[in-house]
Amino acid sequence: MSTTVVKPEIIAQYKTHDKDTGSSEVQVALLTARINHLTEHLRTHRKDFHSRRGLLQMASRRRKLLDYLKKHDLPKYTELLQKLNLRK
């Protein structure tokens, strides 16, 4: 996953307005892409515990953003979960 190629595509897909780069939806989508990429890395490198810690931190940050979104805008929260194929 090259972040210079993938990041603008994700931002374009989930942005809420033209100059949006930091809304909760965009942040969750970017974190999900990084989490998915790191999960694949950890499947082949099982003993990479430093990366595993980073994965857990990213998952926790994503969970906090999703909780915020759920509290403040429930329709966007459910739509985002469906788009990203996330549970809960």
Swiss-Prot record:
Xref: InterPro entries: Ribosomal_uS15, Ribosomal_uS15_bac-type, uS15_NS1_RNA-bd_sf
PROSITE patterns: RIBOSOMAL_S15
Molecular function terms from GO: rRNA binding; structural constituent of ribosome
Pfam families hit by this protein: Ribosomal_S15
GO cellular component, one term: cytosolic small ribosomal subunit
Family matches, as SMART domains: Ribosomal_S15
Keyword Ribonucleoprotein: yes
Gene3D superfamilies per the UniProt record, alphabetical: 6.10.250.3130, S15/NS1, RNA-binding
Family of the protein in this entry: Belongs to the universal ribosomal protein uS15 family.
Description of how the protein assembles with itself and partners: Part of the 30S ribosomal subunit. Forms a bridge to the 50S subunit in the 70S ribosome, contacting the 23S rRNA.
Function comment: One of the primary rRNA binding proteins, it binds directly to 16S rRNA where it helps nucleate assembly of the platform of the 30S subunit by binding and bridging several RNA helices of the 16S rRNA. Forms an intersubunit bridge (bridge B4) with the 23S rRNA of the 50S subunit in the ribosome.
Name the UniProt record assigns to this protein: Small ribosomal subunit protein uS15
